[in-house]
């Protein structure tokens, strides 16, 4: 019972921390607000995470853990790319804290471990897209004279960025708008990579 209660408290603290850090960043976040929102005292917060920076790191890791993407190794490159872009959009739309906390990971006072966790997540996402592009080159679907790395980085950045206008364009959360943006991005990349 004690372990379950402890886990539930820790999870409440992390959920409150994600909201606070996503809203205010590391420098503007206040541990008293996090503790109040989680229904615990500040001492318990420090008991679990050691410091505000430790709590920030744990919150970033929790957000990134939920934002895992899985690239399919089967199918046509264009369809695999479409699926992966959709996954990137979905994890971003499903975790409003993701983009703000990723951006905050490069600010002053953030631990190297937090910045490294974000860099590793981003590198895995780029690697997944790059692999699809390389597979497309090997199978003859895409030109072999292209460097897949910068294209992959552009695809990941654009995929993550398409969620922001979709949120502001339609109040419902706008999966229709995200679908249109995803399809346009994939079409642009496939057209650029195609043999001419």
Where are these regions (language model features)?
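N-terminal intrinsically disordered/low-complexity leader segments
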Residues: 1-8, 168, 196
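Helix-turn-helix
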Residues: 12, 16, 20-54, 58
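Amphipathic, non-transmembrane alpha-helical scaffold segments
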Residues: 56, 60, 103, 115-126, ...
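Short, basic, alpha-helical segments at the C-terminal edge of helix-turn-helix-like DNA-binding modules
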Residues: 61-66
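Hydrophobic alpha-helical connector segments
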Residues: 69-100, 148-155, 182
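C-terminal peripheral helix-coil segments that are non-catalytic and often amphipathic
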Residues: 87-94, 123-139, 154-196
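Amphipathic alpha-helical segments used for helix-helix packing
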Residues: 92-116, 164-168
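All-alpha amphipathic helical-bundle segments outside canonical DNA-binding/catalytic cores
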Residues: 116-121, 138-154
């Amino acid at each position: 019972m004690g372990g379950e209660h402890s886990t539930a408290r820790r999870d409440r603290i992390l959920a409150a921390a994600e909201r606070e850090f996503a809203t205010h960043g590391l420098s503007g976040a206040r541990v008293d607000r996090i503790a109040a929102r989680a229904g615990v005292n500040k001492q318990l917060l420090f008991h679990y995470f050691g410091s505000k920076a430790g709590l920030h790191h744990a919150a970033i890791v929790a957000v990134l853990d939920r934002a895992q993407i899985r690239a399919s190794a089967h199918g046509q490159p264009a369809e695999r790319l479409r699926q992966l872009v959709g996954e990137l959009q979905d994890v971003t739309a499903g975790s409003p804290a993701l983009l703000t906390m990723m951006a905050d990971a490069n600010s002053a006072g953030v631990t190297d471990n937090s910045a490294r966790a974000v860099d590793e997540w981003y590198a895995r996402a780029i690697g997944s897209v790059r692999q699809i592009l390389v597979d497309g080159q090997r199978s003859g679907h895409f030109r072999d004279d292209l460097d897949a790395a910068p294209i992959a980085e552009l695809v990941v950045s654009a995929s993550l960025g398409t969620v922001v206008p979709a949120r502001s364009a339609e109040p419902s959360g706008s999966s229709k708008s995200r679908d249109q943006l995803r399809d346009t991005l994939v079409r642009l990349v496939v057209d650029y990579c195609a043999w001419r």
